[in-house]
Structures are given as structure tokens and as C-alpha cells.
From Swiss-Prot:
Record protein name field: Chaperone protein DnaK
Induction summary: By stress conditions e.g. heat shock.
Keyword Ligase belongs to the record: no
GN (gene name): dnaK
Job description of the protein: Acts as a chaperone.
Segments for region (Disordered): 603-623
Length: 637
């Protein structure tokens, strides 16, 4: 069995790790970095760029450069958070036929799992290049507060990328695994505060030693799947836009190119202000009007940035309070606070967390890598390479069904340890009712309509009976990935109906299979593109070498030689501009043949010159050779 890799599929950055010889190794990508920007770009010549290459060209190609797509995964187009995102990103977010939020690039609609699959493919290849063998299995992390649709969509992304997703685990739980595996014996309770690029999670986790086994039990989890570093960037961007408007009267919001440059500058300034008190945001030629080019130059202090984002930081405290309450604990019961996610490097975040929990957070966990490390450990547990770890995760939100009067009736309460199974008996609302619709919901509100609809199915052919008489047993079964299976059974007839919840949205099996096929076809297309690029490079090199040879040959090349070679050169140059690899190779071969007589003539002349060198010169060269004396030096080091 091959290795099971651990992937942190982040909103802003992604990371891949593997357990090797008992140690976790975070794998560097082709660019030499341990994290990869979760950015995908589609270029004008049909190439798909992922990671740093995509980020580098974002300024010149904003409409076709996709970032923070994780914020859209498993979401409906109508959701407020999606509508808010549409205003902020330069690329196009559109409504899919099934009502989901998709993106549109170059006239083609694509599902978020399809886009995320490109990042996962890059992670998969990074691991394969390092291990020197194919990788087909992975553990992928998701925010703890992801609902069923979002988890399912993440699993779909893995399948599209050619990965068998062995387990979906929560990011804070993964971070706790990374932190707790090598800790001293004894029980302790930790808070994992995970503020990433696009999501916020907090989990209360008890790490216990049971019969020599590390047991990680999640007591409670809470969060906000639309709060993260991207929102901090947006606040700073808005401030810079306002300052520039005050100064020049120009609103940059309608200029995608300027906004992309601003986004990069804001992110850089935010990072700098974690270690300095003040920074300059300087963007020359950011735009132009009738009076000429305009430059943006704004000084931003740490205090200013903190005032812009203070309410965002405060928004993270209420989920912390709720998680503690759900776990039945007080702040004083917490032994350690672990910070995860790049945004936790901000001093204001660290200060706010320390004030709330009454203790400084640990600094020995790398906030960018801990989640991938934990995923790799879980992968090793599933592969049987690590024996002394037991992970008990929870479902983040209450699951139930809609009952009479539009009420949400919960079957599995939030923070229930998974996997779990729960049944409850319901009945009909009307006399002689022949069918019931089971409407599955997820959320904490009493009103059914206020919760997330996960799907509906019908149980038909119920024998006629007065209302309240038929007994319909509804069973909810959550697997270890946090994905829900629901069944309904008429106890009188034994008739049963069941579904794996794929959400009222989500991708159908046919769509996923099509995307898997597309991804495989793209891999073939990518290989052909690489081969074509290599052929073009070889063609260019041969053109350059041949032109150099003609120049060096001077009058040794006859007019006939030159004419033959120039004709072949022209044909190869034309072929290099085209897209036919076979044509390029054929014209390279033709040019080599055309230039061979001249090359042979020049080689023969050079050889003749070597033989004709005066004997006196050779004798003189021999006289110049000096015998050197040497002494052996012993190295005693």
C-alpha cells in the first residue's frame, strides 16, 4: 500500500506532509516553498497555472486568476456571504443550474471543487516528486465549522484530482494532533484557535493518555466559515481606496488591474505590520486620468490597521465563549492555547486571545504547517503506521428534520462525537396520508427555514390510517468524515428509503465522473503542452546555433550553402510559431540535414589547421612546462 499524504487545503495557502520513519516531513513544492498559494490562473494560451506562478501573473490577468475559492465551496449562489464576495473579487461568480455558486472563466462555468482539484493535483504531484512513486490516497482537512455540503464538495475535489480521500478531518483537530503527539504524559485540555485566510474555527480538545494511547477527544467546536485573513485584507484595501479617492478624486474600485495591485500591496503591508510599527504602501502609476498618471502613496501604521480590523478580531471571541460553554468548561480549565493560521501572527490577535483566555498562546507550533502535519499523522494512523493515537471528532452543527409547523426537530445534537447513529419515530400529519417528505436540515435555529437545507426525499406507499398512527422511523448515521446518511422506514410495512446526503445542491455523480475525466484529459493535454514547449525551445536553440555557424563560416559558406540553410531556417522558424510538435521536429531534422555539409566543411578545415601548426610553436609550448615541487600536507582535523 502506498503512502497516505496529509493535505491542508487552505483558502489562501495549501500545504502537504507525509510521515516518514516516524517523523512528519512537510514537502517543498517545485518552487522550493513549503506552502503553495491556493491560486489558479488560466492564461490566454490555454495554460493552467497553480500556486506561485499563478500569483505572479495575477496583476496582469485579474479576471482569469481565481483565489479564495474555498469560500464558495458547497455554497448556494443566493447566500449573503456569496453576494458579498461577488463585490470583492475581480473574477466572475455565477449561478449554476443547480443554484450553487460557481465561477466563470473565459465563458466556461466551473464548480469550486473543480478549481480546488487543481490545487490538490499540485499537492499530489509535489508529494509524488518527493517520494518518487505514485500517490493515490490522502487525508484532507476542512474547517471544523464546515457543513455537510462543504465537506462533501471537498471530498469531490479530491476525487476530481485523482485522490481517494481516506478521511476528511477538522483543521483544529489536525493542529492538536501535530501539537499533542510528542507531549508529556497526562491529561490536558487545549484550545485550538484557527484563524486562516478565509475561515475561523475554535475547538476545545482533551488530550488524554489511555492505556498508553494518545486519545484526542474534541469536546466542542465553533466558528465562522466566512471570517479570515482575506477579510482583514479587504478592510485595508477599502481604506487605501478611500484615501486615494480623497486625494485624487478617482475611485479605483472599477479598475480590476489597480484593485489586483492593491490586494497584493495590502497583503504585504498587513504582514509587514506584524513586525514593524509603520509601513508605506507605494504604487506608482496605479491609474491615470486626463491630467496624467497617478501614484498611490499611503503611510499605514500598526495602530491604524488595528483600528480597521478590531471588530473582526472581536468577532472571533464569541465562538470561543460558545465552544467553552458547550464543552462545559471555564477559561481556567484550559491548559494551553494553540494558534493556527497565518492571520494569528498579527499582534492584536495574539493580545486579544491572551486577554480572553488569561494566558499567552504557545509559540512552538508553526501556524502555516501544523494542520498539514496533523493530517499526515492521521493518514499514518489510517495506514496502520501509527498505532497509539485515537481521534474522536465531533459534528459541528445540529442535524434534524422539518416537522409539522415548519419546526426543526434535532436528531443529532451539535458536538456529538462521530461516527454516530440516532433513530427517532415520527408519524403522519394528516389522515390517510400516503407519503411523507423527509426534509433534512443542519443548524441551530428552531425555525426550519432558518437552517441549512441538506436535502429531501420521500417515503411513499404508507397504508391509509388516521393521522398519528403510522410509525416512521428516521435514522441519521454520520460517518467518520462527518458526512451524513439518512434513512426512513415505515415500521408497519418494513418499506425503507434512504439517501446519502449530497445536499440540495452539490455535484451529481455524473458531474463528478465527467470532471474526473476532464482532469485526466487535462493531464494528457498538459503533457502535450510541455512536450510542445520543449520542442519549441529545441527549435529556437537550433536556429540560434545555425545562424551563429553561418556567421562564423563567413566566405567559407557558398551562396548555394547559404540559400539551402536559409530556406530550412525559415521553415523551422515558422513551425516553431505553430502548435504542431511533429512539424517542428521534422523541420529541425531538415535544418540539421541542410547545414551538415557546411558543418563538415568547417570541421575538416579546423582539423587541417591543427595539423599544420608550426613544430617550433609546439616545442616552445613544451619548454613552458615547469615541474612543480610538492609537499604532502597531513590533515589532522
Amino acid at each position: 500500500m502506498g503512502k497516505i499524504i496529509g493535505i491542508d487545503l487552505g483558502t489562501t495557502n495549501s500545504c502537504v506532509a507525509i510521515l516518514e520513519n516516524g517523523n512528519v516531513k512537510v514537502i517543498e513544492n517545485a518552487e522550493g516553498a513549503r506552502t503553495t498559494p491556493s491560486i489558479i490562473a488560466y492564461t490566454n494560451d490555454g495554460e493552467t497555472l497553480v500556486g506561485q506562478p499563478a500569483k505572479r501573473q495575477a496583476v496582469t490577468n485579474p479576471q482569469n486568476t481565481l483565489y479564495a475559492v474555498k469560500r464558495l465551496i458547497g455554497r448556494r449562489f443566493e447566500e449573503n456571504v456569496v453576494q458579498k464576495d461577488i463585490q470583492m473579487v475581480p473574477y466572475s461568480i455565477v449561478k449554476a443550474d443547480n443554484g450553487d455558486a460557481w465561477v466563470e472563466v473565459k465563458g466556461q462555468k466551473m464548480a469550486p471543487p473543480q478549481i480546488s482539484a487543481e490545487v490538490l493535483k499540485k499537492m499530489k504531484k509535489t508529494a509524488e516528486d518527493y517520494l518518487g512513486e505514485p500517490v493515490t490516497e490522502a487525508v484532507i482537512t476542512v474547517p471544523a465549522y464546515f457543513n455537510d455540503s462543504q465537506r462533501q464538495a471537498t471530498k469531490d475535489a479530491g476525487r476530481i484530482a485523482g485522490l481517494d480521500v481516506k478521511r476528511i478531518i477538522n483543521e483544529p483537530t489536525a493542529a492538536a494532533l501535530a501539537y499533542g503527539l510528542d507531549k508529556a504524559k497526562g491529561d490536558h485540555t487545549v484550545i485550538v484557535y484557527d484563524l486562516g485566510g478565509g475561515t475561523f474555527d475554535v475547538s476545545v480538545i482533551e488530550i488524554a493518555e489511555v492505556d498508553g494511547e494518545h486519545q484526542f477527544e474534541v469536546l466542542a467546536t465553533n466558528g465562522d466559515t466566512f471570517l479570515g485573513g482575506e477579510d482583514f485584507d479587504i478592510r485595508l484595501i477599502d481604506y487605501l481606496v478611500d484615501e486615494f479617492k480623497k486625494e485624487s478624486g478617482i475611485n479605483l474600485k472599477g479598475d480590476p488591474l489597480a484593485m489586483q495591485r492593491l490586494k497584493e500591496a495590502a497583503e504585504k503591508a498587513k504582514i509587514e505590520l506584524s513586525s514593524t510599527q509603520q509601513t508605506d504602501v507605494n504604487l506608482p502609476y496605479v491609474t491615470a486620468d486626463a491630467s496624467g498618471p497617478k501614484h498611490l502613496n499611503v503611510k499605514v501604521s500598526r495602530a491604524k490597521l488595528e483600528s480597521l480590523v478590531e471588530d473582526l478580531v472581536q468577532r472571533t471571541i464569541e465562538p470561543c465563549r460558545t465552544a467553552l460553554k458547550d464543552a462545559g468548561l471555564d477559561v481556567s480549565d484550559i491548559h494551553e492555547v494553540i494558534l493556527v493560521g497565518g492571520q494569528t501572527r498579527m499582534p492584536l490577535v495574539q493580545k486579544t486571545v491572551a486577554e480572553f483566555f488569561g494566558k499567552e498562546a504557545r509559540k512552538d507550533v508553526n501556524p502555516d504547517e501544523a494542520v498539514a502535519v496533523g493530517a499526515a499523522i492521521q493518514g499514518a494512523v489510517l495506514a496502520g503506521d501509527v498505532k497509539d493515537v485515537l481521534l474522536l471528532d465531533v459534528t459541528p452543527l445540529t442535524l434534524g428534520i422539518e416537522t409539522l409547523g415548519g419546526v426543526m426537530t434535532g436528531l443529532i445534537e451539535k458536538n456529538t462525537t462521530i461516527p454516530t447513529k440516532k433513530s427517532q419515530v415520527f408519524s403522519t400529519a394528516d389522515d390517510n396520508q400516503g407519503a411523507v417528505t423527509i426534509h433534512v436540515l443542519q443548524g441551530e435555529r428552531k425555525q426550519a427555514a432558518q437552517n441549512k437545507s441538506l436535502g429531501k426525499f420521500d417515503l411513499a406507499d404508507i397504508p391509509p390510517a388516521p393521522r398519528g398512527v403510522p410509525q416512521i422511523e428516521v435514522t441519521f448515521d454520520i460517518d467518520a468524515n462527518g458526512i451524513l446518511h439518512v434513512s426512513a422506514k415505515d415500521k408497519a410495512t418494513g418499506k425503507q428509503q434512504s439517501i446519502v446526503i449530497k445536499a440540495s445542491s452539490g455535484l451529481s455523480e455524473d458531474e463528478i465522473q465527467q470532471m474526473v475525466r476532464d482532469a485526466e484529459a487535462n493531464a494528457e493535454e498538459d503533457r502535450k503542452f510541455e512536450e510542445l514547449a520543449a520542442a519549441r525551445n529545441q527549435g529556437d536553440a537550433l536556429v540560434h546555433a545555425t545562424r551563429k555557424m553561418i556567421t562564423e563560416a563567413g566566405d567559407k559558406a557558398t551562396a548555394e550553402d547559404k540559400a539551402t540553410i536559409e530556406k530550412a531556417l525559415g521553415e523551422l522558424e515558422a513551425a516553431v510559431k505553430g502548435d504542431d510538435k511533429a512539424e517542428i521536429e521534422a523541420k529541425m531534422s531538415a535544418l540539421s540535414q541542410a547545414s551538415t555539409p557546411l558543418a563538415q566543411k568547417m570541421y575538416a578545415e579546423q582539423a587541417q589547421q591543427g595539423e599544420d601548426a608550426p613544430q617550433g610553436e609546439q616545442a616552445k609550448a613544451a619548454d613552458d612546462v615547469v615541474d612543480a615541487e610538492f609537499e604532502e600536507v597531513k590533515d589532522n582535523k
